[in-house]
A protein has these predicted regions:
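N-terminal acidic leader/helix
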Residues: 2-39
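Short, flexible helical or helix-coil boundary motifs
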Residues: 26-31, 35, 45, 49-52, ...
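Short, compact, well-ordered microdomains
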Residues: 73-102
Length: 102
């Protein structure tokens, strides 16, 4: 299952398919970025070395924002809109993405 490929609209017989694939690819990229940032912030907060209370508050705020964004993307993968855009199984895609982070 390749999720890193998009086609040029000029070469595509069905331009809507290229757009649909680009939407899915961007959602996958955004999910990966959120996962990486969440892990980095959680590690930073867990170590707590050299972090002032103000920095800890700011990091927790950032963590919340990334968790919210990741949740929205997760919801998208289970949405009817996702199934209109793609034949992929959203649950399997998420399992695969979550395995990448481990």
């Amino acid at each position: 299952m390749s999720i890193s490929k998009t086609y040029g609209v000029k070469d595509e017989e069905l331009p809507w398919r290229a757009l649909a694939e680009a939407v899915i690819v961007q959602a996958v990229k955004d999910y990966r970025i959120c996962s990486q940032r969440i892990r980095q912030i959680q590690n930073r907060l867990h170590r707590r070395t050299g972090i002032t209370p103000a920095e800890a508050i700011e990091q927790k705020w950032r963590l919340g924002r990334y968790l919210d964004a990741q949740g929205a993307i997760r919801d998208f993968f289970f949405s009817p809109r996702f199934h209109v855009l793609s034949d992929l199984n959203g649950r399997k895609l998420l399992e695969r993405l979550d395995q990448e982070v481990l």
